[in-house]
Each structure stands twice: as C-alpha cells, then as structure tokens.
Amino acid sequence: MSHLQQKFGAFPTGIWVALLALAILMLAWGMQAYSLLNWDHAVSLGIQNERFSDDPAETAWALESWGVAMADMLWPLPLTVVALVGILRRRFFGLAAGLMACAVGVYFPLFFAFQRWQTFRGTVFLTLMLFSAPCLIAVIGLWANRSWFRDS
C-alpha cells in the first residue's frame, strides 16, 4: 500500500486513483442523466431497454432501469460531486463521500454483471473493468491516505 501513498505531483497516488475513479463515475451518472432526458436515443445506443415493447419482460426491465437511473440522480451523483470537492479541498467529508461513492461504483457493476452475465458477457466484463476495478483500488487508495485529509 505504500505505493498508493507516494506523492505524485499535488496528491499521493491513491488520491489520484480516487479522483480518476470519481471522474469515471461522473461519466456513468452522466449517461444515466442522458437516459432520463432522452430515453429513446439511449435505447438506440443500446444502453437502456425499450419501455414500450410488446414484450412484458423487456418493459419491466426498462422500468427497473428507469428507476435505477432516477435513483442515481438522487444519491450517487450528488455524493460523487461532494467527494470530488471534498478530496480536492483535503477535507474529511471528501474521504467519507469518496469511500461511499466508490462503494457504489463497485456495487452497481456487480449488480449489472449478475443481472446480465448470460446475455451480455462482453459488456459486463467491460463494465467491471471500467467501473468496479478503479473504484475498488480507489477505496484502498483513499483508506491508505486517510491521514492526508484534514478534519476541518
């Protein structure tokens, strides 16, 4: 873990990893926000399911995805913004919010993976590598550098 504590420019390496993971999470929340604004185009891109399908399973899956997208706007998106601001200001709330946001970043791809492994293995693997792996390393990096944060 000492390599995550090595200073690299303005921040220790573990903090850089956390900032990168949080930036990647902002991409995920941005895609979810876009889905809510233009669901039909998100369907055409293949990132959401058709809401008005004749297939009841497809419709149910789309409604579940819409609910997840809405929930992402209410909790993980603001939490990620708070984490970024707090980490850049070296505040303890940044550490706490960063750990929480990255925990969500590990959880949601695992949920996605178990839900869709049989039909979308390539996408599942990409999602795990793009989101879960950096977020897991970010949790370790934040924890390794917890003394770097100021209490006030």
What is each PLM-predicted segment?
Residues 2-152:
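Topology signature of small-to-medium multi-pass alpha-helical membrane proteins
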